[in-house]
Regions:
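Sequence-level detector for compositionally biased, low-complexity segments
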Residues: 1-308
């Protein structure tokens, strides 16, 4: 048979999209099983199990929705028939049912109102109370309070044939920050004594001239490198990302630091001088579905040009 390529599986039994042979020699970023990774801990974003009640662009809407849910919960405490009732007041998850069946009384807590990153560059108000959060993973030691300060590198969890995505955030992340989920590498962790670095010093010592406060910019610069994305495309789609110990670290640190500043402070970027904002007296927010026209014009699409 002509024009056929003989394929042999590699040591990891990959037939197609074979992983790079040197990936295992790179530094692990996270490992739940032992202490051989650069970060002491990494975590998924919070999974509320009831986004329609706990998240919104309006703070008052979140407060009202959660007060109604908690009132409904309290009013029906002890009545297991409530599960069979149709209601818009509450969403029953397994964890909430367990509390309900233990007759656990719950109340609204104003100090659990957070601003979080719901989707990339999309902030919302969150009601982040462990009692009303289906899965919080390790977020309780990353953002234990509203006032907790932290920077996270949020990674796309399942690339599934797409490039690795990495976004620097300084807010509580949703579990589905990216499609397929996200994993987050925090700069700090918190305990009863306060915050401490999440960088494991024993692993950091393997890097020449890399300090703890340069770790995140260094990683950020690497993960936004086209060379890294192309070389380890198959690896990061199947395994947790790793990083190389490069000689020219300062170059990646500088680029990573600039990108982090841009992505963290995107709302403070000055508007272009030539941009004019025109306000309509009677604005229309009706969106017309985009579609291809039968006879293509120079754009090829019919779009709503009243809003962006």
């Amino acid at each position: 048979i002509e024009n056929f390529e003989l394929i042999k599986p590699n040591s990891k039994f990959d037939w197609l999209n074979q992983r790079n042979s040197d990936f295992n020699s790179l530094i692990k970023l996270g490992n739940k099983r032992n202490n051989d990774a650069l970060f002491i801990e990494y975590t998924g974003g919070i999974k509320t199990g009831r986004d329609a009640w706990t998240t919104n662009f309006s703070k008052n809407t979140v407060i009202k929705s959660m007060e109604n849910s908690i009132k409904y919960y309290q009013d029906n405490l002890g009545n297991l028939e409530v599960y069979n009732l149709s209601t818009n007041e509450i969403s029953w998850t397994r964890s909430l049912k367990q509390r309900f069946e233990r007759f656990q009384s719950l109340s609204f807590k104003t100090d659990r109102l957070y601003i979080g990153m719901y989707r990339p560059f999309t902030k919302k108000y969150f009601y982040y109370d462990p009692d009303w959060t289906d899965q919080q993973y390790k977020m309780s030691i990353v953002f234990p309070t509203q006032l907790s300060e932290n920077i996270l590198l949020s990674l796309s969890n399942k690339t599934e044939g797409k490039e690795l995505t990495c976004l620097a955030i300084d807010l509580l992340p949703d579990v589905n920050l990216f499609a397929g989920g996200s994993q987050n590498l925090p700069e700090f962790l918190y305990d009863n004594l306060g915050k401490y670095s999440s960088i494991r010093e024993s692993i950091l010592n393997n890097f020449n001239s890399l300090t703890a406060d340069s770790v995140l910019p260094y990683i950020y610069g690497i993960f936004h490198s086209k060379e890294y994305k192309m070389k380890y495309f198959a690896d990061v789609s199947k395994e947790f990302p790793r990083i190389p110990n490069l000689k020219n670290k300062e170059k990646f640190i500088n680029v990573g630091r600039k990108l982090m500043d841009l992505h963290l402070n995107y709302e403070e970027v000055p508007i272009y001088d030539d941009v004019e904002i025109q306000l309509s007296v009677q604005p229309s927010y009706k969106v017309t579905k985009m579609k291809f026209v039968k006879k293509r014009d120079e754009n090829g699409k019919l779009v709503n040009d009243r809003s962006t």
